Amino acid sequence: MNKMEHMEIKQLVVSMSLPIIISMVIQALYNIVDSIFVAKVSSDALTAVSLCYPVQTIMIAIACGTAVGFNTLLARYLGEKKFDYANNTMMHGILLGLVNGLVFLVLGLLFSNVFLSLFTSDQNVIPLANTYIRICTMFSFSVFVQIIFERIMQATGNAIYNMVMQGAGAIINIILDPILIFGWFGLPEMGVAGAAIATVIGQFCAMLIGYVITKVKIKELDIHMRNFSFSTPILCKIYKVGVPAILMQSVLSFMTVFMNMILAPISAMAITVFSVYYKLQNFLNMAVLGITNALIPIVAYNNGANRKDRAIEAIQFSMILSIFIMAVGTIVFQLFPKQLLAMFSANDQMYGLGIPALKIISLSFVFAGISMVLCAAFQALNKANTSLVITLARQLVILIPLTYGLMKCFGIHVGWYAFVVTEFICTMYSLFECRKMKR
């Protein structure tokens, strides 16, 4: 019995989204754990790590976008029982991960100073941020290859191993962070460098676990260079799907860069507050993204099978779940902003900027949840352009100019309302497009 067509919709959405949510939340832990421990070193150290966040998001965007194209092609060859092509595709994916890591190693060594100079001239912060960026980019091959192994497991129906791999990496990172940052057990106190080293060790261990699982458990595939034969068509097929996915994923990276540029003239602490907000909010985003990632194949399958009733029910139930998650998040941000900031060793300046920011921006959460679900539904129903327009408007086209204008004219606290206005406009547009489709 095909569960996509016959399993009860609520059970189907939950069963498919839960492993994805867990994997995504674990991924979000890397940055937030670093920030919590680094904040105990100094506010300059936290600012330094915050400035590096866009670099990490662009690496993840390229890794995940490449992996989307890779996963699509690998799954197709496995479905067609073309195992030689599948093995060659797998080897291309792993080698692409290594090449992408090499590119970021070079970029990190050559251009980290140029990148950081866009946001700050503080000589207390720049050396710390430089150290963090260079360590993370030097060993970035780990995260690129790790994400390829994740997609291998998804394509072969072994998604449960993702949680093992990512969970192990996150736990190693959490254990090593205080040891390396504060110099426990006789080790030298490394501060920001220790946080970066803990992160890359966690990612490297996760990559190794992914390799072992693929080698031992995935019987359909065989990791070996004898299965590799350079193929331009395979690369083109990977990036035909991968490039649009990279661009979609990169929107967040560009948004954080532009926001940092808007906030830099106000103060370095304003950048830190925004980074802390985004890392906290990312837990909610990851939960909703887990739901939407599960929703897309459910809606696409049932729409294709002419079971539009099930497709509509899946969208409605996903909407309810997302609104609930975002509403809970809004309540937490409204009632406990000081406690949330306290995790990052906040000082009076951070509280003064951060408490209003968390309270104001959180008013946009429910609208964001609705837009994210409808964007996923549009993708599943072959309305990818509509989804792209909404995503660009939410993250760049409306948000950035509106934030800049409000902050320039009325100050930073009023500027945060740009998030609320943007999400409201995009939700209204999403609902309008939804009504058009119903007609």
Task: List the model feature ranges, each with a label.
Residues 1-17, 74-141, 189-243, 299-364, ...:
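Short alpha-helical transmembrane segments in multi-pass integral membrane proteins
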Residues 4-36, 40-41, 57-69, 73, ...:
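N-terminal transmembrane alpha-helices
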Residues 15-34, 135, 146, 169, ...:
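Transmembrane helical elements of multi-pass membrane transporters/channels
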Residues 24-28, 61, 101, 105, ...:
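Residue-level hotspots within the lipid-embedded alpha helices of multi-pass solute transporters
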Residues 25, 29-47, 116-123, 179-190, ...:
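Helix-terminus/linker motif at the lipid-water interface of multi-pass membrane proteins
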Residues 46-109, 143-162, 271-331, 335, ...:
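Small-residue-rich hydrophobic transmembrane alpha-helices
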Residues 58-61, 173-178, 207-211, 283-286, ...:
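Hydrophobic transmembrane alpha-helices of multi-pass small-molecule transporters
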Residues 67, 136-154, 162-170, 195-208, ...:
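Short runs within selected transmembrane alpha-helices of multi-pass transporters and secretion channels
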